[in-house]
Amino acid sequence: MEVLVNLMPHELVLEIEGRRYIVDHVEGAAVRVSYDLEEIFKIGNKIPVYREVPDSAVVKGLPDPEPGRYFVTSAMVARAAQRPDVFSPNTHPKYVKRTRRTGPIESVCGLISYI
């Protein structure tokens, strides 16, 4: 059996072929990513602009892989994890449902892999 585990701090609402699926978040789950930054320049000699140092990301709190178990996290965590079992919600404007054109996202129609 395949299981989708929501590690985000809120529920995930998927709308697939006209049906809604609500995936509750795991209580107490705290998956985080940290990375090093380096200043690349200043705007107007005052406002610093940083970039993420390549390959410096460290993911904490992500469970180890298990066959048939898939994890949904934030895009930042999924991108840093670089694992085939870790995804983020597909929030591309073409693939979300909203009550208003610029309103909050009600549901997504799929997930995104970053590998």
Would you name each region that the model predicts?
Residues 1-3, 7-115:
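Intrinsically disordered, low-complexity segments enriched in small/polar residues
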